């Protein structure tokens, strides 16, 4: 996908005429490795080779607008009503973002009214009175809690109904905290707002524990989620090692992207096999997964497998397990996945039993347990900074954009880019290389290079 500078420009509602509460402190700032001036931009690419492909002057190279406070803002804070909604699945840090938005709006911009719309459908006609007035007192301790005080839900809503709700509540700036579905909803909402000629800024704060949203170094909540997942891998590793012919399997979230499985496996440093959606694998054959697990059990007495939920979805019907296959779609239109954890458990157990290695199976599916927890210290800081950036963007009249961290800088990313593609583990990248080095598994099941390393005892 080739992007040009115009693809990365963010829509502005109009001229910024009001003094920002940060104008004085900004006048003392100077561009440095740790500060990007408001008129500067952050390059899309960060390698010489990729920049050379564009053959453009630096001012024309693809780049994002830097996030942060501006000297002049578009909205008069004294007249602003802000709205906040959380969409999609839970994620560590949702309450931290809500708290950060409310604090920044109230304390620094002196915004008098902030409306929280409950459960996503709170924006529709039937539920538009299902709101909560958000103040610093209301959100004071919510960062210590998992989930979201506003509730969340899946499923599309009518954009025109949502716009009417915003108009009835007098909302001037709207913050949408959500994943790919939430960003699509924010895009539709923005289009409906523009069609009606309303002066409402819509800013997204992208979230997903899968880390599968593009144009962000890492999505908030991901670090908390994979840290929690590490505990389950460590637990199943202890169980497998203590059992005769033990095989431990941990199934983790990751519908299309295997970041949680990869990072958690690296952190635990005890997995023998990591399976992700981006890297297909075969079960059968001398160099398939089942034979590999058998060799592990014979060589060291046990094996630990970490699998992302979206891995191996092509294997179900081929192995006569249609009852485990996903059917239909969920409320957000996502195809329901087959249970790869159960497929692996039954297949490995049957294979080892037939090979005369009666296995002791240990299977853990922590599922929601890794996403419903409070944010850890890292994500708490990250969420707060994203919230600050979102408020600055909205008050400066930016709209139809999300705030994200890119190349260590906070930037504004147009909604059109947030939903254009999916962030995935690169099988040729250094992250997957680290996984292969740590597990000693073959680059693909069908290769024989890992056999000697298994028997040598290094893995």
UniProtKB/Swiss-Prot annotation:
AMP causes 20-40% inhibition and diphosphate causes 20-50% inhibition. ADP, citrate, PEP and FBP have no effect. It is found in: Cytoplasm. Its main location: cytoplasm. It catalyses: beta-D-fructose 6-phosphate + ATP = beta-D-fructose 1,6-bisphosphate + ADP + H(+). Its cofactor is Mg(2+). GO terms for cellular component: cytoplasm. Induction: Present when grown on one-carbon (C(1)) compounds. Pfam families: PFK (PF00365). The active site is at 210 (proton acceptor). The keyword Membrane does not apply. InterPro entries: ATP_PFK (IPR022953), PFKA (IPR050929), Phosphofructokinase_dom (IPR000023), PKF_sf (IPR035966), PyroP-dep_PFK_TP0108 (IPR012004). The record marks 181 as: Important for substrate specificity. Mg(2+) binds at residue 180. Pathway: Carbohydrate degradation; glycolysis; D-glyceraldehyde 3-phosphate and glycerone phosphate from D-glucose: step 3/4. One of its GO terms (biological process) is fructose 6-phosphate metabolic process. Keywords: ATP-binding, Cytoplasm, Glycolysis, Kinase, Magnesium, Metal-binding, Nucleotide-binding, Transferase. Homodimer. Catalyzes the phosphorylation of D-fructose 6-phosphate to fructose 1,6-bisphosphate by ATP, the first committing step of glycolysis. This is ATP-dependent 6-phosphofructokinase.
């Amino acid at each position: 996908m080739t992007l040009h500078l115009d693809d990365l420009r963010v829509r502005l509602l109009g001229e910024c005429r009001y003094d920002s509460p940060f104008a004085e402190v900004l006048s003392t700032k100077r561009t440095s490795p740790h500060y990007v001036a408001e008129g500067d931009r952050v390059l899309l690419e960060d390698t010489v080779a990729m920049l050379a492909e564009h053959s453009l002057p630096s001012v024309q190279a693809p780049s994002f607008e830097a996030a942060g406070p501006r000297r002049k803002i578009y909205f008069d804070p004294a007249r602003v009503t802000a709205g906040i909604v959380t969409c999609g699945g839970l994620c560590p840090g949702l309450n931290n973002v809500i708290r950060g938005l409310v604090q920044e709006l109230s304390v620094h911009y002196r915004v008098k009214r902030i409306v929280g719309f409950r459960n996503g459908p709170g924006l529709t006609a039937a539920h538009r009175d299902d709101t909560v007035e958000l103040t610093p007192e209301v959100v004071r301790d919510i960062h210590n809690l998992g989930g979201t005080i506003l509730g969340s839900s899946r499923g599309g809503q009518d954009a025109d109904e949502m716009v009417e709700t915003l108009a009835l509540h007098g909302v001037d700036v709207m913050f949408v905290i959500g994943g790919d579905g939430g960003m699509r909803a924010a895009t539709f909402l923005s289009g409906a707002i523009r069609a009606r000629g309303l002066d409402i800024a819509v800013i997204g704060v992208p979230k997903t524990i899968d880390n599968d949203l593009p144009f962000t170094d890492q999505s908030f909540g991901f670090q908390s989620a994979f840290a929690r997942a590490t505990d389950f891998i460590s637990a199943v590793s202890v169980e497998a090692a203590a059992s005769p012919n033990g095989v431990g399997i941990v199934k983790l979230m990751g519908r299309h992207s295997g970041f949680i499985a990869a990072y958690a496996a690296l952190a635990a440093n005890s997995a023998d096999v990591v399976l992700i959606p981006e890297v297909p694998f075969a079960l059968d054959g001398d160099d398939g997964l089942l034979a590999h697990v058998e060799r592990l059990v014979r060589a060291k007495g046990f094996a630990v497998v970490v699998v992302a939920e979206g891995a191996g979805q092509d294997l179900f019907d081929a192995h006569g397990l249609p009852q485990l296959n996903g059917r239909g779609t969920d409320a957000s239109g996502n195809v329901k996945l087959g249970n790869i954890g159960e497929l692996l458990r039954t297949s490995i157990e049957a294979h080892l039993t037939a090979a005369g290695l009666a296995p002791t199976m240990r299977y853990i599916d922590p599922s929601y347990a890794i996403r419903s927890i409070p944010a850890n210290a890292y994500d708490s800081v990250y969420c707060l900074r994203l919230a600050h950036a979102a408020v600055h963007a909205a008050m400066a009249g930016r709209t139809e954009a999300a705030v994200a961290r890119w190349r260590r800088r906070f930037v504004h990313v147009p909604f059109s880019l947030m939903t254009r593609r999916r962030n995935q583990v690169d099988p040729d990248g250094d992250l997957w290389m680290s996984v292969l080095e740590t597990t000693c598994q073959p680059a693909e099941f069908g290769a024989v290079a890992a056999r000697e390393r298994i028997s040598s005892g290094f893995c």
